[in-house]
Amino acid sequence: MRLLLDINIVLDVAFQRPGEPATSALIARCGREHQAWLAWHSIATIAYLVERQHSAQMARAFIRGLLGWADVAVTQHADALQALDWPMPDFEDALQAAAAVACGAQFIITRNVRDFSGSPIPALTPEAFLAQKASPSAVVTQRGKPSAT
């Protein structure tokens, strides 16, 4: 399964934030069970934030490690224009959704599911995605909430 990881998911790991255990469990499955993708524009932001917190050398090492298990979703001019038309409050999230469409992702994994309600690709938290995989009978709707069916 193809998963686009929102930047906040990668930052969970980089900065060992509270959601990091579930994120690490999900990432451990990437390469074996799932294919992880990152939006092209996320890489620069991740590098900048890691460098700011640590060092340029650590930022490059982190990005190199990241690119060892995640692919990069590249978008085009038309994708950015399309993202402008999606009913999403944050344009950066719309660009994440455009990257998810471009790489053929089935889900966007993020900490802010609510901001992806207008996305053409459903969004889930790492915890919700792992719970869904543990319970295959769970059906996920477009908004990332389990349905009653």
Regions found by a protein language model. Name each.
Residues 1-38, 51-58, 133-149:
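Short, well-structured N-terminal submotif of metal-dependent ribonuclease cores
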Residues 32-33, 69, 86, 119:
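Structured helix-beta-strand junction loops
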Residues 10-11, 43, 80, 116, ...:
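A generic structural signal for short hydrophobic patches within well-formed alpha-helices
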Residues 35, 71-73, 122:
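Conserved beta-strand segments of alpha/beta enzyme cores
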Residues 62-87:
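Acidic catalytic patch
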Residues 2, 98-149:
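Acidic, PIN/NYN-like endoribonuclease modules and their adjacent C-terminal/linker elements
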Residues 37-38, 74, 110:
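Short beta-strand scaffold positions
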